[in-house]
């Protein structure tokens, strides 16, 4: 019996962040000891989004709809999701957040922002400890 490996296509999504948010991501990496494993902000952002897809809850009163004047998003990172995860993220966006966020990229920004504000914990951290 032959076993065929399924081609798992990755989708890259570029997200613009405020510099302070990127710094908070880097602080999170250091506080959780992930810097010892050379984990980068993009990888942590990807983990945050993947965890959120499994439990998609955000405080809608704190959501940012789009770009705010006088608040440049100067940092950029890439979130990499499997095609199925990307489809699921888009389904959640259309069903729950399309009126609160101008795009999926802005939804991802809100996911990261609320994770950091709430001092969330990643499910994958158990593997590193």
Predicted regions and their residues:
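Active-site oxyanion-binding pockets that recognize sulfate/phosphate
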Residues: 8, 35, 98
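Short, basic amphipathic alpha-helical segments that act as recognition/interaction helices
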Residues: 36-63, 100-129
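Extended, hydrophobic interaction surfaces within ordered domains
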Residues: 11-53
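Short Lys/Arg-rich basic patches
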Residues: 1-22, 29-30, 58-94
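Short intrinsically disordered coil segments
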Residues: 30-32, 94-96, 125, 129
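Intrinsically disordered, low-complexity N-terminal regions enriched in serine/proline/glycine
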Residues: 27, 36, 89-92, 96, ...
């Amino acid at each position: 019996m032959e076993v065929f490996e399924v081609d798992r296509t990755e989708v890259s999504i570029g997200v613009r962040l405020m510099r302070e948010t990127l710094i908070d991501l880097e602080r999170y990496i250091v506080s959780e000891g992930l810097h010892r494993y050379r984990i980068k902000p993009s990888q942590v952002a990807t983990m945050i989004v993947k965890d959120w897809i499994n439990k998609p809850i955000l405080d809608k009163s704190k959501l940012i709809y789009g770009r705010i004047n006088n608040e440049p998003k100067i940092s950029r990172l890439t979130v990499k999701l499997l095609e199925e995860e990307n489809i699921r993220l888009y389904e959640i966006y259309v069903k729950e957040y399309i009126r609160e966020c101008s795009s999926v990229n802005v939804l991802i920004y809100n996911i990261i922002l609320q994770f950091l504000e709430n001092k969330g914990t990643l499910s994958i951290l158990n593997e590193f400890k």
